[in-house]
Amino acid sequence: MKTKIINLVVVTGMSGAGKTVAIQSFEDIGYFTIDNIPPSLVPKVIELLKHSEETDKIALVVDMRSRVFFDEINDILDQLESNEELNFKILFLDATDGELVSRYKETRRSHPLAADGRVLDGIKLERELLSPLKSLSQNVVDTTKLTPRQLRKAISEQFSSKQDQSSFRIEVLSFGFKYGLPLDADLVFDVRFLPNPYYDPTLRNLTGLDKEVYDFVMTHKESEDFYKNLNHLIKPILPGYQKEGKSVLTIAVGCTGGQHRSVAFAHRLAQDLKNDWTVNETHRDKDRRKETVNRS
């Protein structure tokens, strides 16, 4: 039986340097993540993951919030280094003292090591305590001049495999305006101006996924013209969203009830985009009218 290799990244560094953004970034590229874990629990988590089929990638934040446990860190790191079933790296996030002070002032949070409330004293003590760990780190990132978006991009580029690059996902969603706009939509397109199959009794109880309705909607000249323009708008901008570090882009297409026109349009768009992107297709309100009729 082939031995399972776990890819482990221990995220550590100065408080305020961006560890929260970092751990969210690892989650976006498919890592199992745990924040603020006591070092003594790291081997136990790895042992559990060895017997799981869910993932072989894990990112853990270990920092001075767990100071009571932090004395164990060197022994734990030695164990990890000697484990042949681990591909193990340390990511250390740093920033200048001035930048860290500025971030603490902005958030109005107290430093975990500033007993008397003086942020700079806490930073200096933390820097001293973390110095040995920083020297062991294979990856040291200075976030002083990085925006959260730039940090996410840096982590994605450094720790994503080629397969992970497909972590950018497009959600194509149809909906009915009468039931409200999707709250998570990034782009919304309105197709209520197109001829409505609802007024044809033979099509009323069907949906945009049925061939009769799909053909009715998509064979009108207005539909063809609009779909062509929609493609010309959407396809060129997708690489830009991916480049900016967005993990999910939701494209919503709406008609009145979300049963006919929007379903047909969203389905065609999703099928076309699947040629080049990872796409999920959802029809939020497709069966809502049927369910309402059945309840009555």
UniProtKB/Swiss-Prot annotation:
Regions that span the bilayer: none
Gene3D superfamilies: P-loop containing nucleotide triphosphate hydrolases
Coiled coil: none
Keywords: ATP-binding, GTP-binding, Nucleotide-binding
Residues binding ATP, per UniProt: 13-20
Pfam families assigned: PapZ_C, RapZ-like_N
Source organism superkingdom: Bacteria
GO MF annotation: an example: ATP binding
Binding site for GTP: 63-66
InterPro entries: P-loop_NTPase (IPR027417), RapZ-like (IPR005337), RapZ-like_N (IPR053930), RapZ_C (IPR053931)
Task performed by this protein: Displays ATPase and GTPase activities.
Family, as annotated: Belongs to the RapZ-like family.
Protein name from the UniProt record: Nucleotide-binding protein stu0831
